[in-house]
């Protein structure tokens, strides 16, 4: 089975929504950066604006700015899809708020764990604690991935209307690269236990 099918081989730019959650989990949450980048790249023409996807992706790491970038992309996805007659609905406002709150909570959790380990020393990092941290990571990555399902569904409807092609059921080379990269993080986490 060829895992590298994409729109150039007769498939739309859509992505099975479940893949978003799976990719979120398996890439240690890093797939989200690619997801936002890919959508800025693909919607640049549809919006008719001089969007710079790389700069916006870097902006995801800048507090405050990232809030506006995330909210704007969720709104743009909804607006462009509606212009093409998409009937799927999601609240870009509530999706943005939930995504930002969860992302912030995960960042705070990570900082608190790091500060605690620095203060108390690495000897406090027991296998049980590592497993607990990994389960919390899994929970956050799952929830963040689930929040991208609704925007992905409306994107799929948009691409179906615009391109008239079937949705691909395979991963792109970029998605496979993120899986490998994220897999390394999971591997490092597991061998630490």
Tell where the protein language model's regions lie, with residue ranges:
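Membrane-interface extramembranous regions at the lipid-water interface
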Residues: 1-61, 65-113, 144-186
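Membrane-helix interface segments in multi-pass membrane proteins
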Residues: 102-144, 185-193
């Amino acid at each position: 089975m060829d895992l590298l099918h994409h729109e150039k081989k007769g498939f739309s730019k859509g992505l099975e929504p479940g893949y978003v959650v799976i990719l979120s989990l398996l890439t240690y949450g890093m797939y989200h950066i690619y997801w936002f980048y890919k959508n800025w790249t693909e919607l640049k023409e549809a919006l008719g604006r001089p969007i710079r996807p790389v700069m916006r992706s870097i902006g995801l790491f800048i507090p405050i700015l990232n809030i506006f970038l995330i909210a704007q992309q969720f709104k743009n996805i909804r607006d462009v899809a509606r212009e093409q007659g998409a009937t799927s609905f999601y609240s870009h406002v509530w999706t943005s708020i939930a995504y930002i709150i969860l992302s912030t909570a995960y960042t705070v959790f990570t900082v608190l764990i790091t500060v605690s380990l620095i203060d108390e020393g690495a000897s406090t990092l027991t296998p049980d604690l590592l497993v607990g941290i990994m389960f919390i990571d899994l929970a956050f990555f799952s929830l963040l991935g689930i929040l991208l399902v609704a925007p992905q569904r409306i994107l799929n409807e948009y691409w179906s209307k615009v391109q008239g092609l079937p949705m691909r059921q395979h991963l792109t080379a970029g998605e496979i690269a993120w899986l490998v990269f994220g897999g390394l993080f999971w591997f490092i986490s597991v061998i630490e236990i």
